[in-house]
Amino acid sequence: MLFLQLPLLLVLLPGGDSEEGFQEPISFQIIWISSFYNRSWEEEVCSAWLGELQTHRREGKSDIVIYRQPWSKGNFSREDLMESEHILRMFFVRFVQAFFNHASQWKLEYPFDVQIAGGCDLYHGETSVGFVRIAYQGSDFASFQNNSWLPSPKGGTRAQLVCKLFNLYQGTLEIIHKLLSDTCPRFVLGLLDAGKADLQRQVRPEAWLSSGPNPSPGHLMLVCHVSGFYPKPIWVMWMRDEQEQPGTQQGDILPNADGTWYLRVTLDVAAGEASGLSCRVKHSSLGGQDIILYWEQHSSVGWILLAVIVPLVLLTGLAFWHRKHWKHCDPSSALHRLE
């Protein structure tokens, strides 16, 4: 019965009303990073994410969890939240203690970093897949699979020793299994339900064209800017008629301060080949009505603005010169000076 509401919630999410929207799972994960400086000094930071949206954060070793969204508690009761937070806190405390106690045996050299990512992926096919992955110094180290810890090939003998120790604690293995298979999917469903108003928000993008620094003599850098859109998935391409231009370069999708996104897409072309090119934008907020901006129109607007601005500047300068010249030649001014 747990996943009976999942298809409906998926439809409510951005992109969920299309076949493409169902291909990607909904991922929730807790990311814990610990930096071990010496035998007694360790710092840590912990955060939780629904996709790329941060929902929770805990700074240092404080027991205070910061809820980053109004709906970050999902539909869990206060008791459920306290119990889950207590279990996770105890797990991380024992995890840190194990690395301190066995640093010499595992040949760990201070300083070093350990990262844990754990959570679950929810799929449209009414399934949930839990995961826990450990990284040491940024490299794959171990993972939790089939109710036990498995070393990564990159972890070598050190990872084998760690997994051998962790697998001795059957009670802890059972708790992890329950968190991944039951607690996590229930909590995610609560988040999706409580936050559906925000998660299904649609904000239309704004797009404009500009020219960047010329990459080489005789070439132009065409730039298509798209900003203010939500959700994040978007398709932007330089086109000639209906043909995608293979030289299109897409930058990173960057966050705006208001929670929307910005993207910059460029195309390097010979100056004589810019005619007929356009930038096309597809986004779920557009309802199938793509934004199409033509480079010729951008160039025409630029020339029109130039044709208007230059005469205005010249007229303003001429008026200023006449005013200054008239002031110096004004007979009344000369009479005042004689008096």
Curated annotation (Swiss-Prot):
Residues on the membrane's Cytoplasmic side span: 322-339
Q: Which cysteines are joined by disulfide bonds?
A: C120-C184, C224-C279
Membrane protein topology class: Single-pass type I membrane protein
Q: Which residues cross the membrane?
A: 301-321
The residue range of the signal peptide is: 1-18
Q: Which SMART domains match?
A: IGc1
Spell out the molecular function terms from Gene Ontology. Answer: endogenous lipid antigen binding; exogenous lipid antigen binding; lipopeptide binding
Binding positions for a D-galactosylceramide per the UniProt entry: F91, F92, V93, R94, F95
Topological domains, Extracellular: 19-300
**Which Pfam family is one of those matched by this entry?**
MHC_I_3
Set out the biological process GO terms recorded for this chain's protein.
adaptive immune response; antigen processing and presentation, endogenous lipid antigen via MHC class Ib; antigen processing and presentation, exogenous lipid antigen via MHC class Ib; immune response; positive regulation of T cell mediated cytotoxicity
Per the record's keyword annotation, is Transmembrane helix included, yes or no?
yes
Query: What are the record's GO terms for cellular component?
Result: endosome membrane; external side of plasma membrane; extracellular space; membrane raft
For this protein, the record's CDD domains field holds: IgC1_CD1
Q: Which residues form the Ig-like domain?
A: 185-295
Q: What else is known?
A: During protein synthesis and maturation, CD1 family members bind endogenous lipids that are replaced by lipid or glycolipid antigens when the proteins are internalized and pass through endosomes, before trafficking back to the cell surface.
What does the record note on quaternary structure? Heterodimer with B2M (beta-2-microglobulin). Interacts with CD74.
Function field: Antigen-presenting protein that binds self and non-self lipid and glycolipid antigens and presents them to T-cell receptors on natural killer T-cells.
Quote the protein name from its UniProt record.
T-cell surface glycoprotein CD1a
Which organism's genome codes for this protein?
A: Sus scrofa (Pig)
Name of the coding gene: CD1A
